[in-house]
Amino acid sequence: MMPIKSIVTLDQLEDSEYLFRIVSTVLPHLCLDYKVCDQLKTTFVHPFDILLNNSLGSVTKQDELQAAISKLGINYLIDTTSRELKLFNVTLNAGNIDIINTPINISSETNPIINTHSFYDLPPFTQHLLNIRLTDTEYRARFIGGYIKPDGSDSMDVLAEKKYPDLNFDNTYLFNILYKDVINAPIKEFKAKIVNGVLSRQDFDNLIGVRQYITIQDRPRFDDAYNIADAARHYGVNLNTLPLPNVDLTTMPTYKHLIMFEQYFIYTYDRVDIYYNGNKMLFDDEIINFTISMRYQSLIPRLVDFFPDIPVNNNIVLHTRDPQNAAVNVTVALPNVQFVDINRNNKFFINFFNLLAKEQRSTAIKVTKSMFWDGMDYEEYKSKNLQDMMFINSTCYVFGLYNHNNTTYCSILSDIISAEKTPIRVCLLPRVVGGKTVTNLISETLKSISSMTIREFPRKDKSIMHIGLSETGFMRFFQLLRLMADKPHETAIKEVVMAYVGIKLGDKGSPYYIRKESYQDFIYLLFASMGFKVTTRRSIMGSNNISIISIRPRVTKQYIVATLMKTSCSKNEAEKLITSAFDLLNFMVSVSDFRDYQSYRQYRNYCPRYFYAGSPEGEETIICDSEPISILDRIDTRGIFSAYTINEMMDTDIFSPENKAFKNNLSRFIESGDITGEDIFCAMPYNILDRIITNAGTCTVSIGDMLDNITTQSDCNMTNEITDMINASLKNTISKDNNMLVSQALNSVANRSKQKIGDLRQSSCKMALLFKNLATSIYTIERIFNAKVGDDVKASMLEKYKVFTDISMSLYKDLIAMENLKAMLYIIRRSGCRIDDAQITTDDLVKSYSLIRPKILSMINYYNEMSRGYFEHMKKNLNMTDGDSVSFDDE
């Protein structure tokens, strides 16, 4: 097993930088057949976050989410009606969840292990929950997070100093509380819902039931607050003919509405007098104790299970006054009836009895083990193989549960190990990027890579890479387009087509296929000269330059015909022009045809409105073109050549240009909120992709899996086979540090450059000796024989020497450029990348020399000064009449 302390996590990185590190460092170490555990493909998000933003729920298990919402609704009602708990820092209103500023009973110093993580990448309520979980007790965090213990599963009973009521049943409390369309009444606890513009029937019936216990004086105010008159008309209820209220506790048909009055309205409206057997009740507490005991008689034993200290008696004493106003104390004792005293917290116990009643007629929620709350046993975690350990620690927040002073706490697992405490369980929270869990993205990316075919890029069909003109005709047409002045759109189209037809008539030879380097320029020039609006967008996808050209209006045969007819052409004349210019028009209407089924989504993410032939209205022609980036452009040559120490070499990202583009693409995918593994795969540069993909598309051997399968019973004759497997695995799957190769490769270029300049100097000296002898002969002829050698002969000799030095320097430049390219290719090959299809051009040689030139400038200057010295020496000895007629020019 890999030592826990040596595992490197990525907790402090976020968004595109984090995802880039995962793809570039973790993904290459996974086999293509690596299977991501299904439990890790989803994560935990606090229900409050999801209720405010439904899209956040896409990364959670729906059954777990529904269970958490139900449980959280119960816990919220318990917390908000209790005088002791006060653990929630929010208040739920119609359509919104508001943060409250009043103190809550949560401590940031309870956990002995200090938390230093912020979790800014999490939604606000999930982040708040996680901070509570890592600073307070695990029990309180589970209460706030809506935890439900799975039945018959491997889970942990957390320890806590004090525990709260644990009710578990299916409900819609949170949805009811957050229902947006409610009457804006003074009493916020009772939410009267509006359905189709009118008070809901259920709430109307309950309010009518409560209304009978409100005094005559307060009823108008009550009716106005809840629009009772409008609702009564809607439901056909005559408020004036309602039966008189039954206000005697002995004959009252139901205590429901009287309890509701005590629960919600007692402090806002005055209540009518309540009687017991004709005697007027004197105390509100006795009324609520009697009614609550009678209504929820069967639930009192269940209440006592949760609150053993609550007073429960077999009788109740009611203080009343008879009709003559004499005090009468009535002791009520009924067979098999208990009376509970809830006066210490009426609101809480009325609410709790309602919860117990709902539980009695509902089904309990069944859930499976949660990786976020229950996790796995620590021993199970330690027994995981290298790949699983690396994958989990890089894609998930990893927590541990431990006990301290008979209380269970949760902290970052590495912090627990550092504090030298013993974890009991390990909990995982898969991270989310761009609306998907990173674990799921990695799974999709591996699947996309495994199912890929040989790489293809959008390549133009060769049959439409010409306009039917020979090379001479094409060049004439190309130059003619450059001369086209700004003219009206219709006129420009007609003139270009007629010019083409004129050139076509006298043109001979096979069609000239447009070269890829001039294709985009020709497209732009052709359509712009015709008056089309042409715009170009360029970017990088993977290791390819992407060009997207949009042409407005859309180019079709019908549009061309209609445009020609607008320029005084008859339909017949327009058809003749089109027939004569068939190859040109076929090229024009076919430019948007490209093939690459793997890149459709890739381009859609670049320009969403350009997918499938342009905008929804079909007003544009879209041309997509992709060309591989040259080798030197993929490499950070400036960073390489500016590094002078080993540390600087190691800090250099060799493939910085394409990696930077990859990060930008990841950032855009994340912002879209619709990132997929296919997106990552399409945007992945070769330097990463080639470290994952092996020849023939087969997966390499997983060292971890292979070592797991080796047992003491393995045949000793398998030693050589196992050794070969290990060597092959190390060769194909172990990531090599590219930067360690740079110093060795590039220093060799400088050394070879010095060696080659010495060789060049020797050869130049030998050749210069011939010119020196020639100059000596001319000097002898003029000095001894007094014969005059013309300046043209002398100048010709000096020009030949200049040509010799130019050729020598050109050969030297080509040699150094090749040496530099060889060093670059050496770096790429040793980095595990494939360069079999690389094609080196003259431009690459020029660029290669320009990159290495600053490092060898002193040697070049030395050679130039040496050559200049020879030139000036010969020129002086030749004694030319016009000495300024020829001079030595260097670079």
UniProtKB/Swiss-Prot annotation:
The precursor is cleaved by OPG083 to give rise to the 62 kDa mature protein during virion maturation. Proteolytic cleavage of major core proteins OPG136, OPG129, and OPG098, which occurs at a late stage of core formation, is required for production of infectious mature virions (MV). Residues 615-697 form a propeptide. It holds the Pfam family Pox_P4A. One of its GO terms (molecular function) is structural molecule activity. The keyword Disulfide bond does not apply. InterPro entries: Poxvirus_P4A (IPR005058). Keywords: Virion. The record marks G614, S615, G697, T698 as: Cleavage. GO terms for cellular component: virion component. Transmembrane segments: none annotated. Core protein 4a is the most abundant virion protein. Major component of the virion core that undergoes proteolytic processing during the immature virion (IV) to mature virion (MV) transition. Belongs to the orthopxvirus protein OPG136 family. Interacts with OPG129. This is Major core protein OPG136 precursor. It comes from Vaccinia virus (strain Western Reserve) (VACV). The gene is OPG136.
